Amino acid sequence: MSLLIGYFLGSIPSAYLVTRRLTGRDIRQMGGGNMGGLNTFREVGVGAGAAVVLMDLAKGALAVSVAYYLLIQNAQWVILTGFAAVIGHNWPIWLDFKGGKGLGPAFGAMLFLLPVYGLPQHLLILALLVFIPLAITRNIALATGIALFSLPFLVWYGSHSEFATLISVLLFLMIGIKFVLDNRKNLRDPANRRNLIVDHWKRPDKNS
């Protein structure tokens, strides 16, 4: 039950709904085609992008909150529910299983999981691992990738839980593989490969 709830909450297509409501267009046909906050920010606007980010974070946080408080699941099932929310975001049943990369619901779940299971300081470390690379590179994808890569080490150091560490590794691999698959055309071009590392956060000039 909790896994289904996690999947269906994660599969709510936030970027699609916000963009369709504001512009009447399909976010999958705009910009890079990704169903996430960054593409919405770049193609629709700051407010729309912020709304999508908050909604995606909420999907992950709500999924694990329901499993923890309402269904009273043990830690393993709560963690798996958060993982299911990321799967739902990446492969939503409502849009032919074509979704985003899972960063929003993943970090949303961690906003709940880390403090609840006694690792609030690791949440601060994770935030620093996002914001410091972001300040240097201006690339939210690279910054969150660094944080996700570090997550298994943080989880193991803080909890020594083999299960939680394994899920952290699988989360990093799933999001990383989804990123590579969704950007395989760009990765073939040296100029585009550079853009995936620097200046990825900048919103394009619509007049250029």
From Swiss-Prot:
Reactions listed under catalytic activity: an acyl phosphate + sn-glycerol 3-phosphate = a 1-acyl-sn-glycero-3-phosphate + phosphate
Keywords for this protein: Cell membrane, Lipid biosynthesis, Lipid metabolism, Membrane, Phospholipid biosynthesis, Phospholipid metabolism, Transferase, Transmembrane, Transmembrane helix
Organism: Dehalococcoides mccartyi (strain ATCC BAA-2266 / KCTC 15142 / 195)
UniProt similarity note: Belongs to the PlsY family.
Assigned GO CC terms: plasma membrane
UniProt superkingdom: Bacteria
Membrane topology: Multi-pass membrane protein
Protein name: Glycerol-3-phosphate acyltransferase 1
Lineage: Bacteria, Bacillati, Chloroflexota, Dehalococcoidia, Dehalococcoidales
Broad class of where this protein is predominantly found: membrane
HAMAP family linked to this entry: PlsY
